[in-house]
UniProtKB/Swiss-Prot annotation:
NCBIfam families: agmatine_aguA, PRK13551.1. This is Putative agmatine deiminase. InterPro entries: Agmatine_deiminase (IPR017754), Peptidyl-Arg-deiminase_porph (IPR007466). It is an enzyme of class 3 (hydrolase). It comes from Shewanella sp. (strain ANA-3). SUPFAM superfamilies: Pentein. Keywords: Hydrolase.
Length: 370
């Protein structure tokens, strides 16, 4: 166990000026970060079910990549008993456990040096549709993770969650208008200004804008639940063939965009379709275990934004969510076809979905820089 309650060195330049860029998720990784789930108004039984699931995710990742977990001081003893022994527990305070969105975006240069981008955070919408209040501890998470690795820090003047962007490492950034252009994120910035900041801090050249993400995704349609890069020139899209399903027009509109765009290198995209599980709904029993608080209520009968696209690429592994016995095997087979060199590891992940996200949302990779 280590303590990371000290800020990282802050830089006054921008990554693009210094020759740094965000690498793709398939680049070599030295670590993956997670955060302990405990929030009783989001996780049933004060996180007990989620904690057991997070332990399984950490174990699956740990076979390929070292895992760090940020844990508030009050929960360290409990985390030591629940988490696999290979997980490095680091004392970090947080309001909730979405490492993808509160953790840093680590950028690298040609020499393999790593630095971190610390984005602004307002709990997915602040006082205009955000998911809880306060979020002051979450705002400090990225700097503490960077301190643990000794990486210098860029502070970006943009409210942005890691789950709202995907890059191919070759100049292309994919995102959704539903999230990045939402009035509850950066209301004073135009699309062009947001693109300019992403060019500065990710060092990308080309943008692929999908209009919307997954139906009922409370993050306002994060790209990481909807579509991701598999490798340069290839994407994986969340899909349903059911034209009566509310997801269909969203996925169809995304497919139309993807079929008619090119990436930063001028390539047309190869598009893989990953089937939608379910539809899945929160049960009465599942909603009962969540207490009332400042978080969004978890209601029985509510449709869950389940998606197999919400997986993590970590070195030679793909860690993906098992969500529906009717489609889990199909998703695993499809992922193995897309990633023939990777080990495909499924983890039962309904408990993460009940809290509003999935495996990609609760993890944040630290590239090796190699």
């Amino acid at each position: 166990m280590t303590n990371a309650n000290v800020d990282a060195t802050q830089l006054t330049t921008k990554p693009s000026e210094d020759g740094f860029y965000m690498p793709a998720e398939w680049a070599a990784q030295q670590a993956v970060w997670m955060i302990w789930p405990y929030r009783p108004d989001n996780w049933r039984s004060a996180g007990a079910y989620a904690q057991a699931t997070f332990a399984k995710v950490a174990d699956a990742i740990g076979g390929a990549t070292p895992v760090y977990m940020g844990v508030p001081q009050a929960f360290l003893a409990e985390a030591q008993t629940v988490m696999p022994s290979h997980v490095t527990l680091v004392e970090i305070d947080s309001n909730d456990c979405w490492a993808r969105d509160t953790g840093p975006t680590v950028v690298v240069n040609a020499e393999g040096e790593c630095r971190g981008v610390d984005w602004g955070f307002n709990a997915w919408g602040g006082h205009n549709g955000g998911l809880y209040f306060p979020w002051d501890k979450d705002e400090q998470v990225a700097a503490q993770m960077l301190k643990q690795h000794g990486f210098a820090r860029y502070s970006a003047p943009l409210i942005l969650e890691g789950g709202s962007i995907h890059v191919d490492g070759e100049g292309t950034c994919m995102t959704t208008a539903e999230c990045l252009l939402n009035a509850n994120r950066n209301p004073d910035l135009t699309k062009e200004q947001i693109e300019a900041l992403l060019r500065d801090y990710l060092n990308v050249k080309q943008f692929i804008w999908l209009e919307e993400g997954v139906y009922m995704d409370e993050t306002d349609g994060h790209i990481d639940n909807m579509c991701c890069f598999a490798r340069p020139g290839e994407v994986i899209l969340h899909w349903t063939d059911d034209e009566t399903d509310p997801q269909y027009p969203r996925s169809k509109a995304a497919l139309d965009v993807l079929q008619n765009t090119v990436d930063a290198q001028g390539r047309k995209l190869k598009i893989h379709l990953l089937p939608q599980p379910g539809p899945l709904y929160c049960t009465e029993e599942e909603s009962k275990g969540v207490t009332e608080g400042t978080g969004v209520p978890r209601t029985a009968g509510e449709r869950l934004a389940g998606s197999y696209v919400n997986f993590l690429i970590t070195n030679d592994r793909i860690v993906f969510p098992l969500l529906d016995p009717a489609t889990d095997d199909i998703a695993a087979q499809k992922l193995q076809e897309i990633f023939p060199e990777h080990k495909i590891v499924g983890v039962p992940a309904r408990e993460i979905l009940l809290g509003g996200g999935n495996i990609h949302c609760i993890t944040q990779q630290i590239p090796s820089g190699k």
